[in-house]
């Protein structure tokens, strides 16, 4: 998942004036629950921000997502969440992320006054699994850096939601082969 950021906001943990972490891009891939964790489907959703409608130059340079893409292709958050729910289907198991994506989505829903459509336990943060496996501080476990940290080829552009999902998936595969996931 990608959300609004500004120069220096990482160091400020997104707590600077006007720096609400508004979700702009959601990527989801489905994996088989087998030894090889094969990818079966994917979806990427652009979201039109409400609170921070103008993307920062820093965000654009970091993600490659342009203002015109968001303006023309971005969905309102309620529609994006409905698309996400349809893709996940009822009964879909846990959503793994490298961080607190579920919390950030919930914060976004609260901030714009819409219901969060997922159970609190739907999202699982793999930070602690990666930290235990790699013995790396969680702050250094950015999804787009996993290829370098774990020794695999990047599956796409850094800070692209689908590419980050594929980084997480490959990290999980490596951990599974090592008997750690």
What positions do the PLM features span?
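Alpha-helix initiation/capping motif
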Residues: 17, 70-73, 136, 158
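Short acidic, Gly/Ser-rich segments with clustered Asp/Glu that frequently serve as metal-coordination loops
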Residues: 1-10, 14
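Metal-dependent phosphoesterase signature
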Residues: 60-80
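Metal-dependent phosphoesterase core characteristic of DEDDh/y 3'-5' exonuclease domains
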Residues: 21-63, 85-181
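Short consensus segments that form the blades of beta-propeller domains
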Residues: 14-20
């Amino acid at each position: 998942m990608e959300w609004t950021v500004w120069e220096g906001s990482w160091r400020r943990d997104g707590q600077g004036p006007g720096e609400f972490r508004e979700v702009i891009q959601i990527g989801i891939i489905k994996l088989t629950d087998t030894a090889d964790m094969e990818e079966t489907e994917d979806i990427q959703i652009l979201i039109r921000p409400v609170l921070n409608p103008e993307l920062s130059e820093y965000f654009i340079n970091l993600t490659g997502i342009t203002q015109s893409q968001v303006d023309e292709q971005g969905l309102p958050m309620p529609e994006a969440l409905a698309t996400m729910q349809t893709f996940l289907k009822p009964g879909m198991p846990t959503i793994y992320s490298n961080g607190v994506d579920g919390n950030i989505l919930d914060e976004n829903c609260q901030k714009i006054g819409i219901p969060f459509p997922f159970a609190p336990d739907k999202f699982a943060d793999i930070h602690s699994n990666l930290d235990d496996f790699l013995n790396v501080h969680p702050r250094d476990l950015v999804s787009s850096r996993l290829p370098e940290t774990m020794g695999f080829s990047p599956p796409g552009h850094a800070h692209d939601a689908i590419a980050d999902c594929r980084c997480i998936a490959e990290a999980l595969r490596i951990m599974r082969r090592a008997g750690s996931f």
